[in-house]
């Protein structure tokens, strides 16, 4: 893929279409925020960022979730920034997004957005 942001068609086809999402405001083109329903009692919002350089994309998601859970927080959503080398193909992108989507669905934590 070429350097820079993904084209809108690749974003829709290889990222947004794959995400299992139960967020109140799901990710979309030009949407720079996400929303979850946190009305079940008093809520404190926390955030965690974890870099993943592996060929095992789930590891980065689980590392970030682990940091939140160990601090006593209940994760309500996932945001991600995906930086791929120019040698990556659209199939590589799809594989990463598919892995993140599997974690999202398994852990019942929606993907709220991110940057690609």
Model-predicted segments: where are they?
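Extreme N-terminal cap/leader segments of soluble proteins
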Residues: 1-54, 71, 80, 98-113
């Amino acid at each position: 893929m070429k350097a820079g942001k993904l084209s809108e068609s690749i974003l829709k086809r290889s990222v947004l279409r794959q995400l299992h999402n139960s967020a109140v405001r799901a990710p979309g083109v030009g949407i720079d925020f996400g929303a979850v329903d946190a009305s079940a009692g008093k809520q404190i919002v926390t955030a965690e960022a974890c870099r993943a350089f592996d060929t095992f994309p789930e590891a980065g998601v689980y590392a970030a979730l682990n940091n939140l859970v160990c601090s006593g927080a209940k994760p309500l959503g996932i945001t991600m920034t995906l930086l791929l080398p120019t040698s990556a193909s659209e199939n590589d992108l799809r594989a990463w997004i598919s892995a993140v989507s599997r974690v999202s669905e398994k852990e019942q934590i929606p993907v709220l957005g991110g940057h690609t």
